């Protein structure tokens, strides 16, 4: 099977304009942009046949080309990263069987998380897979802090007994009681913004209408669920590492703190 990896990157963002070009301090003490850190992660995935950045902004294109990334320009009218990845596939003459959508807001994603995601897609009848993490007390506390501060941050997910996603939300789901927090027991799973698609599912995505829930939550993956297409969740392990996403400028020091421990 041939595999394409696409990093969708847009400059305009209501919460964090210019996020792909945001800089933070890496584990070696040097400043690196979010998009270059994500590209370096992609380069470690040797089983991927081709890797590209898909953007609609010339600033991102020129910056990515400066560190050797291959870039394709996409329409400015696309609504989200999945639509951008689907257009990138079309620009590659649709000659790939599996497509990985590696969004640039998770530079701490371990490579084995992406490997496991693709393995699950290949061996199963699923059309879309995505990784999730059981929240530990520290990450759950950060989710609650973001919520109480009115920041739209990480995404949580609930799923059925077969690990098919039931719902994704920017709210904290399921409801977590104070007793759960105190006893170190919670059932909250953090969604990592990476997807693997069978080509036919991704091609279908741009033809599907945006549903109410997708618009309300601002979560692109809900388009699949609202159109009765399953998303298989793959429970991931950090193997002792820590994880956090870069959704807001306030996340930069959190990620830098984690990187200093690596």
Task: Identify the residue ranges that each predicted region occupies.
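Short glycine-enriched, charge-decorated loop/helix-capping segments at active-site entrances
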Residues: 20-26, 72, 210
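Short, high-confidence coil segments that cap the C-terminus of an alpha-helix
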Residues: 48, 94-96, 123-126, 229
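N-terminal nucleotide-binding beta1-loop-alpha1 segment
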Residues: 1-18
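Hydrophobic targeting segments
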Residues: 2-7, 42, 51, 248
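Conserved core of the sugar-phosphate nucleotidyltransferase
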Residues: 109-208
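Conserved alpha/beta core of the MobA/IspD/sugar-nucleotide pyrophosphorylase nucleotidyltransferase superfamily
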Residues: 94, 168, 182-262
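A short, N-terminal amphipathic alpha-helix
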Residues: 31-50, 67, 226
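Short phosphate-binding loop-to-helix
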Residues: 58-116
